[in-house]
Amino acid sequence: MEEPFLPRDEQLVSCKSTWQSGQVTVELKKVSRLAAPMATVTIAQYLLPVISVMVAGHIGELELAGVALATSFTNVSGFSIMFGLVGALETLCGQAYGAEQYEKIGTYTYSAMASNIPICFIISILWIYIEKLLITLGQEPDISRVAGSYSLWLVPALFAHAIFLPLTRFLLAQGLVISLLYSAMTTLLFHIAVCWTLVFALGLGSNGAAIAISLSFWFYAVILSCHVRFFSSCEKTRGFVSNDFMSSIKQYFQYGVPSAGLICLEWWLFELLILCSGLLPNPKLETSVLSICLTIGTLHYVIPSGVAAAVSTRVSNKLGAGNPQVARVSVLAGLCLWLVESAFFSTLLFTCRNIIGYTFSNSKEVVDYVADISPLLCLSFILDGLTAVLNGVARGCGWQHIGALINVVAYYLVGAPVGVYLAFSREWNGKGLWCGVMVGSAVQATLLAIVTASMNWKEQAEKARKRIISTENGLV
């Protein structure tokens, strides 16, 4: 039976001793043991829709265009919201586990599911009319038809997200990441088989690719539900406290809404980037290259996001346990891992800059452009990794609202205007747009670093315990 990776600290550790190299080394090991499986889980989840897009691309150009458009639209209007909302559980479940309020972990998780499902109904209404909406916005009717049909079959997947995402945070808060790893990898293999069967063996076309996504995410939700229900590792935490249910829903939205803002504002900016690239002088080239850069950046981002999930878990656990010194060392450990991974992957990308474009295109023009913009992408790796880890700190502490406000300032008041100016007024084209993103990331990283460095960790620990133990007295 899997044991949690988060052993209890029997006593508070002095501030001086926590910063000694031995303590940092111990914390590095603990964070790494959480981060590596979570990065793999994130990759597996990310690959499900990617595989469906790849399979649809082998059907025809029309199907590829429609599926890509639907994937972009559903990510922005639905899946990003689900991913954002459950960030609240990284605060609530993690701190409840640290405070040994085990039954509240289950209550928070069930309240998240109950809150997500009505939101899914609202979003699904929008998805039903995607075809008409896209045509109204000037999209090609045939592409809009494929996108509309594909999105309709993704509605069940949206509801699956409402279930499995809270369960993922439920297990992560307890350090049960190996269960998540096995479940995610099993689901990935299941999806490959089901997608091929529905699309090619049964001839369902692009709709089959969407159905495969829905079936796979529900398969994932069922596996996680069975683990929570039947495994002894969750015996203490799967309970339900009915008296706390309504106050838990209020707390979920209190931290979930700014957490959704934290995630969605970033996701939406990159979709805006692709839209702006279509207005440049050579739209096909610019859109292709920026899409490739975005794909490379997203694939890299799963590594620091795994580190961020680990840091968020360690920070929330230790604050809930009243051990702010170790929580602070967890941040240092996360930053050390960020330095190592960003240096490695930036160097790797820069070394392979002249050939990596061939992974996505046979066009010499595209490959050369990707090589030209790769140094900027290397800098993005560094900045994105830092912001990911610091956002993990924000979720662990419960100040998602500050992170969301920083995102508005960094990306929409600074980054986006700079990118548009450089791309159109200075005629830097795609490079200018990407420079704008980098400026926004730099501002975001700077502001998050200032907030983190000036944080009173003892005060954060007191707030965490008050937040969890005094739920019945109202919101904190």
From Swiss-Prot:
GO cellular component: membrane
BP GO annotations: xenobiotic detoxification by transmembrane export across the plasma membrane
A Pfam family the protein falls into: MatE
Signal peptide per UniProt: none
InterPro entries the UniProt entry points to: MATE_euk, MATE_fam
Keyword check for Transport: yes
Principal cellular location given in the protein's record: membrane
Membrane topology: Multi-pass membrane protein
Subcellular location: Membrane
Magnesium recorded as keyword: no
Regions crossing the membrane: 34-56, 73-93, 117-137, 146-166, 184-204, 208-228, 260-280, 289-309, 331-351, 370-390, 402-422, 433-453
Any GO molecular function: antiporter activity
UniProt-listed NCBIfam families: matE (TIGR00797)
The family this protein is said to belong to: Belongs to the multi antimicrobial extrusion (MATE) (TC 2.A.66.1) family.
Protein name as catalogued: Protein DETOXIFICATION 2
Organism: Arabidopsis thaliana (Mouse-ear cress)
